[in-house]
Amino acid sequence: MKEYRVYLERARSRQQDFLYPLIFREYIYGLAYSHNFNRSIFVENGGYDNKYTLLNVKRLITRMYQQNHLIISANDSNKNPFLGYNKNFYSQIISEGFAIVVEIPFFLQLSSSLEEAEIIKSYKNVRSIHSVFPFLEDKFTYLNYVSDIRIPYPIHLEILVQILRYWVKDVPFFHLLRLFLYHFCNWNCFIPTKKSISTFSKSNPRLFLFLYNFYVCEYESIFLFLRNKSYHLRLKSFSVFFERNFFYAKREHLVEVFSKDFSYTLPFFKDPNIHYVRYQGKCILASKNVPFLMNKWKYYFIHLWQCFFDVWSQPRTININQLSEHSFQLLGYFSNVRLNRSVVRSQMLQNTFLIEIVSKKLDIIVPIIPLIRSLAKAKFCNVLGHPISKPVWADSSDFDIIERFLRICRNLSHYYNGSSKKKSLYRIKYILRLSCIKTLACKHKSTVRAFLKRSGSEELLEEFFTEEEEILSLIFPRDSFTLHRFHRNRIWYLDILFSNDLVNDE
């Protein structure tokens, strides 16, 4: 990274065309090759007969410039006619190279912005998924309306490339990137489909994630820009990392849409208590005041996507609901605001009064049905939640089988320990425990009853229920009251950076 930093500092004096030469640096493709296959570029790979060299990549790029895109067919063979090598393999390597090169300036600017804001030490904790829920507990109990928003896709990558050109001044690099997308990914269709997006994301995951995250970052920066301009209140939790020179031209059309109908109304309706939370492709928008303001932001989003990103979005896809009557799903939890009513007797002189107190509490619970559906998909139970054996693991040793089930149980317990109600989590543990017992009984060709009688049911698999208590006892005092209280309350962990699929935990 020091070499990249020195190179970019020299290139900034020219202010353009500083990424294009990196495409022809061999260590870039060495990083891409190691990222995909976890092997060195010079190590022989039997599947490709060691035909991968930088010379072949340069030849492929040259052919991309010379190719007539009018005769490209969607049913082209995977074999490249002018090289005779596997086309998918080279497209994946070049895609990784593009992703690595285009990430460099954004990563360096992001790092410098974090250093200036002096939040490097707390940045890891902020990245945790669970850091969102203390924010929800603190803010959402004072809000009244919530809106679930699904970020629309697919978006044509040509639009993203055009926007990228205004962030990084390097015309040859983005011209080559556009040729690559049209040549290998069949992006010559006018309207991309979800199937083509899915195919591209699987064959070029790193480049797809970068382009998608850039799309989300671009729309969020515009949204926060509009919010700051509308309310004249600067957000302390957000800072613009990059220059804005393309947005101001596009914003004129966006402002015209609202200036006709709301020019005399909007200044009297300002809502500083609007809160926005996003994870992956879903975001939550919550507000305290009247639904009119939520409708205003609803149409802000719709016109932003349609006018700026050319993505069609229907108004009926964004629903506005009351928090007290609607539960929203975020990060694998179901959340809603519950009203707690209590009556207090108050006495003043000779008179006695009954005062009703209403308090709000954010309930965050485990979604039992989606979890059982995931367990059924991974063959731990049937669709009704009845545990079944997993014969695929029967060839492993008893220790490995128990360790695999414990790892899944540990991850689920670690992630869903913030639930208000632990009954659903205990049911998931029970399913995994019986599935483990049935798998061991299947391996030893015995019934569950006979296997438990022979091995001892009390000693077997006791880690499913004791391990979490042992971990808590290392953190908190070992008295029973404290442990019981922490079993009942929520515990959020600041070391969870992503949620694993059950199938990937094998």
From Swiss-Prot:
Location of the protein in the cell: Plastid, Chloroplast
Keywords: Chloroplast, mRNA processing, Plastid, RNA-binding, tRNA processing
Gene Ontology terms, MF aspect: RNA binding
One cellular component (GO) term of this entry: chloroplast
Recorded superkingdom: Eukaryota
GO terms for biological process, alphabetical: mRNA processing; RNA splicing; tRNA processing
Keyword Protein biosynthesis: no
Role: Usually encoded in the trnK tRNA gene intron. Probably assists in splicing its own and other chloroplast group II introns.
Entry similarity comment: Belongs to the intron maturase 2 family. MatK subfamily.
HAMAP family in alphabetical order: MatK
Name this protein carries in UniProt: Maturase K
